[in-house]
Amino acid sequence: MRRKPASLLAGLGLAAAIAAAQTDPGLLTAVVAKDGSGDFTTIQAAMARIGMGSPGRPATIYVRRGVYRELVYAQREKRYVRLIGEDPANTVLVSGLHAGMRGLDGEAIGTFRTPTFHLDADDFTVENLTIQNDAGPVGQALAIAVHGDRVVFRNCRFLGHQDTVFLNRGRHYFAGCTIEGTTDFVFGGATAWFESCDLRALASSYLTAASTPPEAAFGFVFDRCRVQIAAGERSYLGRPWRDHAATLFMRSELGAG
């Protein structure tokens, strides 16, 4: 799906908006609602204002049902924060940037400037939320990029096509999540445990592309997961992005194809 240039310019200006926003250290609970019934009408506005929590008292952003078309950035200072949707079917964070789009300099923005949700913070939790990139089958288009450590996802959906979920580094846990895409839709150098998750391949390609560093004991581990492949398509479980790639499927259901 093509986007208007104004939408792209707004997306690329996200970093400047974040820099101008002032975090409120005392704000540890916030409600996001599109209809104005909460504290904020956008997830990004709440993220920019929420304070850093603690292990015993995490900060929490509650997101009411709705489709939130925006880009969200959780910088490193947003540690011990929970982002909780009402339910993943009806609470959707979505954007449509893709690698071939042109930036302000006239050049393609590239893969790593496309994520709908860019997460740099450690000790972050996301629950009951759909995170989507709806650019379509136009090349690399990330739904989420995770650069923090100890990030937990529960009952979430990650929807896209190529490069849906990028786990750059750190250690992460996915429970009861759905991840959908076409090519390399789980990729990166992180250590990540996926428990009771569904992986849905929309086209013939590769599900994963790990770039596990040589010093890491594990890369991607899928335990009790289900792999579903679209009718008439054939997919591989993975391919190495770099040397030492490590991906393991155990006690999982592997669909035909």
Could you tell me what each predicted segment is?
Residues S7-A17:
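Bacterial N-terminal signal peptides
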Residues M1-K4:
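Positively charged n-region of N-terminal signal peptides that target proteins for export
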Residues Q22-G257:
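Sequence-level preference for short, compositionally simple segments enriched
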